[in-house]
């Protein structure tokens, strides 16, 4: 697949990389829209040691499920992948899961690529009346929301 790869401070390349292999409980998403976050810019400038090169950045994304029972569904992605088993996850506070991961930070590649894999529980369906360009903005809009 094609991906935009962070190669080091102020260096990116558009190149062919290996297709992602979905783990159990993960699905393959064909990325159709992705935002550029301030954290992507910090990484690009070399100001984020949590994002070492080479790495595919991008975590504000929307696309289409391209396999399994939900093949063809339009979705946006919650980029925070939690364990789903700890007390924080059990009380709806996945943001403080001690084992949390975020796409675009190792060990998870990001969405500046044709495809990304993500747990099915991290997907939110996008109604057909909303564009996937708008759906890619759900993550930054949801940053300040918690029930």
Language-model features: locations:
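Short Gly/Pro-enriched turn/cap motifs at secondary-structure boundaries
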Residues: 7, 18-19, 52-58, 104-108, ...
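Residue-level recognition of beta-strand termini and adjacent short loop/turns
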Residues: 8-10, 23
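Short N-terminal binding/cap micro-motifs at the start of the first secondary-structure element
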Residues: 10-14, 38-39
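Glycine-rich beta-strand-centered segment in the early N-terminal region that forms part
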Residues: 18-34, 47-87, 127-130
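Cytochrome P450 core scaffold surrounding the K-helix E-X-X-R motif
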Residues: 39-45
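NAD(P)H dinucleotide-binding glycine-rich loop of Rossmann-like/cofactor-binding domains
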Residues: 83-147
């Amino acid at each position: 697949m094609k991906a935009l790869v962070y190669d080091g401070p102020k260096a990116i390349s558009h190149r062919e990389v290996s297709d992602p292999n979905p783990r159990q409980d993960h699905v393959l998403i064909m990325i159709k829209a992705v935002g550029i976050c301030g954290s992507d810019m910090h990484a690009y400038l070399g100001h984020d040691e949590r994002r070492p090169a080479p790495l595919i950045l991008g975590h504000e994304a929307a696309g289409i499920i391209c396999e399994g029972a939900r093949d063809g569904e339009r979705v946006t992605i919650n980029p925070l992948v939690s364990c789903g088993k700890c007390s924080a996850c059990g009380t709806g506070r996945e943001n403080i899961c001690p084992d949390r991961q975020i796409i675009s930070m190792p060990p998870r590649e990001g969405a500046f690529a044709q495809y990304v894999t993500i747990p099915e529980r991290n997907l939110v369906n996008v109604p057909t009346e909303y564009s996937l360009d708008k759906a890619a903005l759900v993550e930054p809009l949801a940053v300040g929301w918690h029930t």
